[in-house]
Curated annotation (Swiss-Prot):
The gene is pyrC. GO terms for molecular function: allantoinase activity; dihydroorotase activity; zinc ion binding. Belongs to the metallo-dependent hydrolases superfamily. DHOase family. Class I DHOase subfamily. Zn(2+) 2 binds at D154, H181, H234. Its EC number is 3.5.2.3. Pathway: Pyrimidine metabolism; UMP biosynthesis via de novo pathway; (S)-dihydroorotate from bicarbonate: step 3/3. PROSITE patterns: DIHYDROOROTASE_2. Keywords: Hydrolase, Metal-binding, Pyrimidine biosynthesis, Zinc. This is Dihydroorotase. Its cofactor is Zn(2+). HAMAP family: PyrC_classI_B. Substrate binds at H64, F65, R66, N96, N280, H311, F325, G326. GO terms for cellular component: cytoplasm. It comes from the Bacteria.
Amino acid sequence: MYRLIQNGQLLIDDQLVKRDIAIDEKGRITAIEAQITPTDEPTETIFDAQGALVSAGLIDGHVHFRDPGFTDKETLQTGSQAAAHGGYTSVIAMPNLNPVPDNLSDFKTLVARNQTETSVHTYQFAPITGDLVNNDLVDMPAFKAAGAAGFTNDGHGVQDAQTMYLAMQQAAAIDAPIVAHVEDISLVNGGVIHDGAAAKRLNVPGIPSVSESAQVARDIELARATGVHYHICHISTKETVALVRRAKADGVNITCEVTPHHLLLDDRSIISDDTMLKMNPPLRTLADRQSLWAGLMDGTIDVIATDHAPHTAAEKSQSLLQAPFGIVGSETAFSLLYTHLVVNGPFSLAQLLAKMTTVPAQVFNLPAAGQLRVGDQADIAVFNLTQPTTIQATDFQSKGHNTPFIGETVLGGTELTLVAGQVAYQRSK
């Protein structure tokens, strides 16, 4: 446990300013000052940040820890260690597990395991319906009382409008968000990548943009009618951005997220049968990606979430038609985004950090997270903004190495992550 972080750079009023941070034995921040003189207490341990960025720990509203049911892909331990490696101190896990925690007993067990078996604060979404695919709603008030951060069938869109309408009514009544994977399965037609030039060239079925935007349009009207907080997962199309922008202007209680891979890649990258580029929703067109950047800049898109989705090497070694959707992202998100959006792009560091700290804390109602404040628990990430590093699978804490970004050189690697003052990750020297 570190009791003092010295020589850090905090972002204050869009400027990096030298600050020291003192932490007490309970893991709470006791002082943030230009200079804090170390005491002579033998329990005090000092971390010299050496001019690195010291930030509030990042918040990821969309991770898949695969535990229980798919522990060959990930476990609570490895998934949370991967999050800590990426500078995340709070995450919200998806319920597409085996068994699906759609009964109160299983859900309570999972919440308890999240609290005792993970390296970071791990919150849990509950399913909207039984088994994620039927039309029987879970007991939302009971699940919220048991700790549900919201309700989602992630991995599946809610296909029946009446089911979604009733779910939104119940969620609105208990002030809980509906977190939607938006996908009209009747329009997907077995697609594996975006329905565009790459799909035609590779002769594989494509997923049309309207499979996303059609369900978004439906759900916006249901959200308007019910007043629920409606949050859209991993948006990918320019049509969705336009729909969300219009809905926000109309006063609909709507938020949304975008992933790093949808910001950084498009379907021009798919030149072969490369399953590291297979995810759901798929990589769309350059025009879609440009719209995502614009939406992130103007506030239409609220937060960045990784959709960290580990799979085994054997699964991802199959063809595009057979391999599962998804890539890992927890360990690379900040460094990739800092390098491409800030250093080589139009975003400021303040804008990037807001989308990964303060705004997700607001969107997901985590008032103790997302800021560095005296009296709060010391959830802290330290990033080296000047030293280039190469993304290597051998450095990953996750069981999953399925990412197209292996080998890329980035800035912004994680030096240290503290969760409630305890070391969750520290880079080896």
